[in-house]
Every structure is written in C-alpha cells, then in structure tokens.
C-alpha cells in the first residue's frame, strides 16, 4: 500500500485529507490545499489484502483487433497467474462508447481462446467481482467519485473548453507543462453553488500536490519516480457523467482485488494518476510490473506499416497458436538457458516475472515463422496430416483431405513447411514438371553434359516396355530395386545416376527424397486424387515431354523453347 513519510524539511510531505483533522475536510479548504509543502508516495511491494492470493487481469479495449503486444501482455499475466496458482481475470474496458463494439470484443475473446489463454473470471465466466465490462460498472464509479468529492480529493471544475485551451496556450508560451491552473481548485462554496444554480457543466478534477514526487517499486524496472509539479489536477469524471480511464481502472483493480498489474510500459504515466487515486480512496496498492514495448526491426514502435500486427492476421496466415505463444513469450523473457522451444505448459512451469527484460523486444517475423515450423512438425502425425490435408482440399489441389496419398505426401513434404499455408506451394511444386526451364538453367549444364540424353533414351525405353509403370505400381521397394538394376545397366551409381533421374522424372535439380517423390507423382495420376485444374503433370505426360526434347540443340547451348515448359499454374 502507499505510505507517507514525515520528517525534516527535505523529507517534508503534504498531508492528505484522510489524515487531516475533520475541520480541514471541506470543499472550500483552500488554505490547506494551497500550502506549498512537498509530497511523496511510495508504492511498496506488498500484495493486496485478499488473503495473499495472486489475482491479475488483462483489460483490452474492444476498439479493434488484438495487437501482438496486447497478446503478449495477456500471456505474461496468464503465465504469472498459473505459475503462482492465482486467478487470471479478463475485463473489458469499453468506456470509449463511440469506438467500442461488441464485434471487436468477440474478436478479442476469440483470439485469446485461440491462443489457449483461458480466463478464470470475465465475459462468459462467472465470478465474485463482476460485472466484467466497464460499461456495466458506472454506478460503482459514480459512488467512488462522490466519495472523493466529499473527502475533498476532487472538486468541481466549471472551466469551459475555451478557458482550458487558453491555459494550454499560455503554458506553451511560457515553456511550462500544460497543467491545470484554473480557479476552481480553490473556489468557495458560494462560487460553486452559483455555477450549480446556473446549470453550468462541470467535471470532477483530482487535486494533485503541487510539489514533491511519487515513487513506485516496479517489479521489472525497479524504482520509478515522477515529479508531481508536471502533472496538474486531472479530470476523473467528464461533464457528461462519464468516468475517465484512469479512474475506472483504479476502482476496478481495487474492487476486483487485483494483486499485480502487469502491463505495457506505455501505461507508466497512467500509474502516476492511479497511485494518487489509490491513496485518496484508501485502497491498498497492487504491485506494478511494466513490460517493454515490442519494436520493429528498425527499433520503432511496431505498427501496421511493418506488416501484420494482430493475432487474427497471423491466424489467417496459417500460424499455429503454439508457435505464436512460444514466440511472444520470448519477446522480453527467457528461462536463462539456450532453449527456445516451449509449450504453454512448459512456460507455466518456468515463467517468472523477475526474468522479464525491461529493454525493448524486436519483433522478427522470420524467427516467428521458423518457430512456427518447429511447432508444426512437433504435432502428432495424425493432427499434422489432418491440418495439411484439409488445407490441400480447401485450396483446390486435392479432391479429398485424407487417404494414403495425403499421408505419404505430408510425411515427405513436412520438412519444407513452416506454415500450414506453405503446404500449397510444396505440393504444387511436387506436382509440377518445369523440365525445359530446368534444362535451360546454367545449374543444369553439368548434368546435361554428362550424357543426359543417353539416360533419357534408356528411361523412355524402360517406360515404354512397362518396366517403370510396373515398378511404380508395386511401390517404394520395387522402385528402389528397379533403380539399382537400371544403374547397373548404364554403369552409373550415386550422383551420376540419381541426378539424371531426378531431372528427367521430376523436372527439377533439387527436392525432397527422390524415390518417394517419384512414387507419389505416379500415384497422383490415379483417378480422383488431384483436382484437374491443379495443373498436375502426370507420369505419362512427362514421358511425352521427354520424347520431344531436342537434345542436339541443348548440347550446342541453344535456347530451349520455354513455351513448352510444363509447370503448375498457381
């Protein structure tokens, strides 16, 4: 809780009304509030008086999508609560009535659920501290605003918008902070009653000591201190009766028995106002922990101009929740080892707020993609195959999402997949046959010069005789046996055998395991496997293209007509 310290002049502090004699607790107590003493509040690291239990909250505003920075804040709160056996509370801060929508709220809830961050209290989950939307707690805010008015911590301010603008302009001319300097902080009862009778609109302003400092002990940043003379009296209730953000947050955190407030460092200025309200309402102070911002590679604040920034966007791009959670956890936290692969359960076990770094964390989309691939390949085969198979069918490549072809294709191609959406490209690449483009490339020249035309002639003869179709029909074992015999007949082995076969049968110089690839290409030619519009080049069509190759022109370094290249249309 916040504490006040009295002593020698350099430690002298200003009395707050709840500590002052009763005769000073009046709205017109101008002498008391005009005293120029110094003031200091220290937020000690002591838990809220809620039985010692840990209660944290994530409080998004439903005005848009869930940003990755917000998702990381939610994750750190979730991990802290779970690691301490505490409660993770979800509160919707929808006081911005013009921008807040239920559609945005639903999207945020969906993103949190997708990440696996289930909340113990909040929308859809009953609890003892509801309601959990700020728009449904207005009566509570008004109750505490009136309490502050009665104690003298806030006062009615009847300044017009024009007057406030003029104050800011004057402060700017004098190169002073734009703090409130209006007369209503020291107005008499008579002056106030006169304005009330006229029906003049007013706000509630919080009295801020004019000198001194406020300190908190942040769990991540250590001691943080502000000079109070830079703040000025701030509004807690607007003229339309709507409470402002800092007032709502303080009342909510206190009445919901929140023990730890873990949030982004951009909220540090809010902590100054909230700490003053805590003390004025005699609320116990929670422990604060302000995490660093997530930065773009150029060290500016991550924004839309840097690409995808919302959880929903990454979900639509094919990222897994496991990969997102793992990567977000490492943006400013580590367990002290070289390990970078964590499941959500691992993170709950190892997380500690003491290991959260106060320096800005760089968001590296390449690293996120790599990490997603690690989690994708760590999935059980059945789950991975289901994900990829459904993707291939929905993308219009395969007619079915399951079966032996899907199983074998996923097993062959999974090392080249980092996102589920990558699976389209790798399968289309397997099904394509860009032979002419490959033969025309400089990289293929050594293979062409190694009597590739002779291997092609022998291969065509073996296909026409039925040897190749027969071996492929029997499967991987029979195909390997045939390749070995074919190599002996040509007196070739190793690279001198396998490279020509890869080029001539797949149309490429590189790719996944050759034998399995060729067997799968043959199987893809069976009826009902590949969607006709997918651009698949069957084994029969490949040999037709092989027969039309002008090997003499190739050996003379003449250009190959690229219009005859067989590729998949994407």
Curated annotation (Swiss-Prot):
Residue numbers covered by motif 'HIGH' region: 60-70
GO cellular component: chloroplast; chloroplast stroma; mitochondrion; plastid
UniProt cross-references to InterPro entries, sorted A to Z: aa-tRNA-synth_I_cd-bd, aa-tRNA-synth_I_codon-bd_sub2, aa-tRNA-synth_I_CS, aa_tRNA-synth_I_cd-bd_sf, Glu-tRNA-ligase_bac/mito, Glu/Gln-tRNA-synth, Glu/Gln-tRNA-synth_Ib_cat-dom, GluQ/Sye
Transit peptide as recorded in UniProt: 1-39
Enzyme class: ligase
Binding site for ATP: 67, 266, 301-305
Subcellular location: Plastid, Chloroplast; Mitochondrion
Swiss-Prot/TrEMBL keywords: Aminoacyl-tRNA synthetase, ATP-binding, Chloroplast, Ligase, Mitochondrion, Nucleotide-binding, Plastid, Protein biosynthesis, Transit peptide
Pfam families: Anticodon_2 (PF19269), tRNA-synt_1c (PF00749)
Main location: plastid
SUPFAM superfamilies per the UniProt record, alphabetical: An anticodon-binding domain of class I aminoacyl-tRNA synthetases, Nucleotidylyl transferase
Top-rank lineage group of the source organism: Eukaryota
GO biological process, one term: glutamyl-tRNA aminoacylation
Gene Ontology MF annotations: ATP binding; glutamate-tRNA ligase activity; tRNA binding; zinc ion binding
Motif range ('KMSKS' region): 301-305
EC number of the protein: 6.1.1.17
Transmembrane segments: none
Reactions mediated catalytically: tRNA(Glu) + L-glutamate + ATP = L-glutamyl-tRNA(Glu) + AMP + diphosphate
Family classification: Belongs to the class-I aminoacyl-tRNA synthetase family. Glutamate--tRNA ligase type 1 subfamily.
Entry-linked PANTHER family: GLUTAMATE--TRNA LIGASE, GLUTAMATE--TRNA LIGASE, MITOCHONDRIAL-RELATED
Protein name: Glutamate--tRNA ligase, chloroplastic/mitochondrial
């Amino acid at each position: 809780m916040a504490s006040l310290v009295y002593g020698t002049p350099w430690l002298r502090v200003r009395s707050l009304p709840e500590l002052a004699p009763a005769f000073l607790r009046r709205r017109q107590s101008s002498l008391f509030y005009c005293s120029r003493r110094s003031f200091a509040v220290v937020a000690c690291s002591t838990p809220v008086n809620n039985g010692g239990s840990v209660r944290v909250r994530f409080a998004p505003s439903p005005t848009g999508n869930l940003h990755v920075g917000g998702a990381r804040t939610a994750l750190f709160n979730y991990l802290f609560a779970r690691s301490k056996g505490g409660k993770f509370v979800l509160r919707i801060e929808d006081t911005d009535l013009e921008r807040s929508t239920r559609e945005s709220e639903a999207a945020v809830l969906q993103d949190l659920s997708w990440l696996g961050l289930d909340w113990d209290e909040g929308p859809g989950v009953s609890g003892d501290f509801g309601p959990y939307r700020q728009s449904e707690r207005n009566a509570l805010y008004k109750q505490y605003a009136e309490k502050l008015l009665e104690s003298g911590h806030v006062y009615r301010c009847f300044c017009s918008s024009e007057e406030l603008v003029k104050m800011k302009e004057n402060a700017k001319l004098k190169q002073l902070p734009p703090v409130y300097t209006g007369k209503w902080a020291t107005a008499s009862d008579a002056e106030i009653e006169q304005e009330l009778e006229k029906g003049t609109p007013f706000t509630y302003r919080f009295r801020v000591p004019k000198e001194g400092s406020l300190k908190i002990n942040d769990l991540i940043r250590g001691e943080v201190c502000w000079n109070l003379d830079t703040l000025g009296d701030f509004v807690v209730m607007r003229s339309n009766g709507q409470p402002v953000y800092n007032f709502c947050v303080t009342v909510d955190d206190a009445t919901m028995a929140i023990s730890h407030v873990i949030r982004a460092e951009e909220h540090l200025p809010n902590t100054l106002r909230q700490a003053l309200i805590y003390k004025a309402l005699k609320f116990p102070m929670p422990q604060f922990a302000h995490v660093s911002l997530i930065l773009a590679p150029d060290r500016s604040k991550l924004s839309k101009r840097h690409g995808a920034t919302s959880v929903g966007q990454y979900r639509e791009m094919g990222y897994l929740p496991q990969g997102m959670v793992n990567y977000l956890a490492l943006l400013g936290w580590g367990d002290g080892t070289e390990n970078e692969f964590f499941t959500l359960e691992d993170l709950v076990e190892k997380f500690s707020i003491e290991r959260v770094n106060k320096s800005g964390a760089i968001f590296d989309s390449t690293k996120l993609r790599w990490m997603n691939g690690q989690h994708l390949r760590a999935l059980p085969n059945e789950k991975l195959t289901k994900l990829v198979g459904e993707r291939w069918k929905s993308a219009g490549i395969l007619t079915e999402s399951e079966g032996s072809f899907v199983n074998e294709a996923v097993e062959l191609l999974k090392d080249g997949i980092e996102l589920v959406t990558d699976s389209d490209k790798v399968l289309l690449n397997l099904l394509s046959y860009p032979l002419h483009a490959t033969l025309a490339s400089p990289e293929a020249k050594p293979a062409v010069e190694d009597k590739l035309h002779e291997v092609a002639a022998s291969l065509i003869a073996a296909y026409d005789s039925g040897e190749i179709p027969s071996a492929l029909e029997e499967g991987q074992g029979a195909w390997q046996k045939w390749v070995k015999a074919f190599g002996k007949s040509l007196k070739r082995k190793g690279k001198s055998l396998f490279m020509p076969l890869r080029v001539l049968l797949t149309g490429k110089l590189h790719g996944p395991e050759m034998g399995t690839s060729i067997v799968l290409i043959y199987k893809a030619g069976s009826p009902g496997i590949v969607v006709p519009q997918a651009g698949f080049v069957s084994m029969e069509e490949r040999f037709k293209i092989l027969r039309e190759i002008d090997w003499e022109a190739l050996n003379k370094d003449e250009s190959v007509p690229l219009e005859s290249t067989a590729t998949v249309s994407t």
